[in-house]
Amino acid sequence: MYQPDFPTVPFRLGLYPVVDSVEWIERLLESGVRTIQLRIKDKRDEEVEADVIAAIALGRRYNARLFINDYWRLAIKHRAYGVHLGQEDLETTDLKAIQAAGLRLGVSTHDDMEIDVALAAKPSYIALGHVFPTQTKQMPSAPQGLAQLASHIERLADYPTVAIGGISLERAPAVLATGVGSIAVVSAITQAADWREATAELLAIAGVGDE
């Protein structure tokens, strides 16, 4: 039963790019994307605050679901749509503050044990990864593959889910066929020969999500 302690999100968030700059946020929102995450790693809050402010403003302008990865204090301060946290961030984050601010929460998972941890937090959605090998970030866990992803989806039933990790344009239909609500992509867009074409094709497959 989907009863999060945080505001709900649609079961289908649609195409969900994860990018590291305001420039990419603006490009992709202009191209029709309506769910997106700003993920800037390993900087102090004061170093990223201007980017967080700009990204949130763009999200509002385009009526988009803009998630801030990790910088939850800034997300609360500037009223982002939501926050996304990794497993390692859950213990050091004031989840009640995020909840009280009315922000949505997404949590990363890599196996059944981490899904248990995520479910205990009752987030708005659960991210499942990494599905395929990925060069975007160093991963201590092994790729889960489609069969394991489908097993997680069956377990989570009506919980909004996002698949992430090595999802290319070619692999996207098979990933969505597992029943996962959304697909997060990184290099499939940012490293594409033609990012506009890649974005349009991925939007045609994954959509923009439910209202």
Curated annotation (Swiss-Prot):
Its EC number is 2.5.1.3. This is Thiamine-phosphate synthase. Keywords: Magnesium, Metal-binding, Thiamine biosynthesis, Transferase. One of its GO terms (molecular function) is magnesium ion binding. It catalyses: 2-[(2R,5Z)-2-carboxy-4-methylthiazol-5(2H)-ylidene]ethyl phosphate + 4-amino-2-methyl-5-(diphosphooxymethyl)pyrimidine + 2 H(+) = thiamine phosphate + CO2 + diphosphate; 2-(2-carboxy-4-methylthiazol-5-yl)ethyl phosphate + 4-amino-2-methyl-5-(diphosphooxymethyl)pyrimidine + 2 H(+) = thiamine phosphate + CO2 + diphosphate; 4-methyl-5-(2-phosphooxyethyl)-thiazole + 4-amino-2-methyl-5-(diphosphooxymethyl)pyrimidine + H(+) = thiamine phosphate + diphosphate. 2-[(2R,5Z)-2-carboxy-4-methylthiazol-5(2H)-ylidene]ethyl phosphate binds at T134, Q135, T136, G166, V186, S187. 4-amino-2-methyl-5-(diphosphooxymethyl)pyrimidine binds at Q37, L38, R39, I40, K41, N69, S108, K137. Belongs to the thiamine-phosphate synthase family. Condenses 4-methyl-5-(beta-hydroxyethyl)thiazole monophosphate (THZ-P) and 2-methyl-4-amino-5-hydroxymethyl pyrimidine pyrophosphate (HMP-PP) to form thiamine monophosphate (TMP). It comes from Salmonella typhimurium (strain LT2 / SGSC1412 / ATCC 700720). One of its GO terms (cellular component) is cytoplasm. CDD domains: TMP_TenI. Its cofactor is Mg(2+). GO terms for biological process: thiamine biosynthetic process; thiamine diphosphate biosynthetic process. It is an enzyme of class 2 (transferase). Pathway: Cofactor biosynthesis; thiamine diphosphate biosynthesis; thiamine phosphate from 4-amino-2-methyl-5-diphosphomethylpyrimidine and 4-methyl-5-(2-phosphoethyl)-thiazole: step 1/1. It comes from the Bacteria. Binds 1 Mg(2+) ion per subunit. Mg(2+) binds at D70, D89.
